[in-house]
C-alpha cells in the first residue's frame, strides 16, 4: 500500500489452494491458520496465544469452522502457527499454488506462489524506475532473506538470526524497537 492507503499491487491466493490448506489445518488443535483478505481476518481456532497476538495488532478475527466460511476468492496472505508442519505438508504434498517461509519460531507466512517481500520490492522498483541495486532492505528473519541477499544494501537489525547477519552488507547493533533507524542513518552518513 502507498502512503495514501492506495493498493499498488495485489496478488491473490488461488481459491482451491486456500480451501485445501484450510481443510488440512481445521480440526487439529495443534495448528492455527490465519487467513487475511480485504476487510477480513479469520483464524481456524482461538487460543490464548492467538488472542494475545490479535490484541497486539488491534484486530478481532472471525473464527471459521469450515473453508466455505472464508472469502476464498480474495485471500491475500495466510499465516500458520503452532504445528506448522501440518500446513507445510499440505502445501508440499498437495501441490498447492502457495509459497511459505518461516517468519518467527513456530510461525510461517503463506503467500500466493512467487509472492514475497523481495518480489514486492522488485515490483515497486519497476513501478518507480529504481534499479534494485539502488535499494536498501532491512530485516531479521528468514522471510527477509531474499531482500537482504539481493538488495543493493542488505541490512540486518540487531536481533536478526545469525544466518541473516551473515548475508547482510550492514549489521546493526540495535533492533527495530530500539533505535535501529537512527543507527542506520549514522552508518549510511559515515559511508
Task: Walk through the language-model features, giving the residues of each.
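Conserved acidic, metal-coordinating active-site core of Asp-based
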Residues: 18-20, 24, 28-138, 142-145
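Glycine/small-residue-rich loop that forms an oxyanion/phosphate-binding "nest" at active or ligand-binding sites
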Residues: 3-19
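Catalytic cores of large soluble enzymes that bind and process phosphate-bearing ligands
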Residues: 9, 13, 79, 173
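Mg2+-dependent phosphoryl-transfer enzymes with acidic/Ser/Thr/Gly-rich catalytic loops
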Residues: 109-191
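Short, flexible loop segments at the rims of nucleotide/cofactor-binding pockets, characterized by
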Residues: 10-11, 54, 149
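Short glycine-enriched loop/turn motifs at secondary-structure junctions
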Residues: 3-5, 69-71, 103-104, 149, ...
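Short, glycine/charged-enriched secondary-structure capping and boundary segments
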Residues: 6, 47-51, 90-93, 151-153, ...
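Short glycine-/acidic-enriched loop or helix-start segments at secondary-structure transitions
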Residues: 3, 44-46, 87, 147, ...
Amino acid at each position: 500500500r502507498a502512503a495514501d492507503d492506495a493498493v499498488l499491487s495485489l496478488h491473490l491466493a488461488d481459491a482451491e489452494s486456500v480451501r485445501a490448506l484450510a481443510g488440512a489445518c481445521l480440526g487439529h488443535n495443534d495448528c492455527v491458520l490465519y487467513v487475511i483478505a480485504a476487510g477480513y481476518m479469520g483464524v481456524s481456532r482461538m487460543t490464548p496465544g492467538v488472542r494475545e497476538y490479535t490484541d497486539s495488532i488491534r484486530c478481532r478475527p472471525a473464527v471459521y469452522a469450515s473453508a466455505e466460511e472464508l472469502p476464498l476468492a480474495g485471500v491475500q496472505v495466510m499465516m500458520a502457527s503452532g504445528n506448522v508442519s501440518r500446513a507445510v505438508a499440505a502445501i508440499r504434498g498437495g501441490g498447492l499454488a502457495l509459497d511459505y517461509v518461516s517468519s518467527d519460531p513456530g510461525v510461517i507466512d503463506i503467500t500466493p506462489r512467487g509472492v514475497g517481500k523481495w518480489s514486492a520490492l522488485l515490483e515497486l522498483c519497476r513501478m518507480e524506475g529504481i534499479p534494485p541495486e539502488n535499494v536498501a532492505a532491512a530485516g531479521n528473519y528468514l522471510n527477509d532473506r531474499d531482500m537482504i541477499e539481493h538488495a543493493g544494501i542488505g541490512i540486518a537489525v540487531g536481533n536478526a538470526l545469525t544466518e541473516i547477519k551473515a548475508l547482510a552488507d550492514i549489521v546493526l547493533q540495535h533492533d527495530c524497537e530500539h533505535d535501529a533507524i537512527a543507527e542506520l542513518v549514522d552508518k549510511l552518513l559515515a559511508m
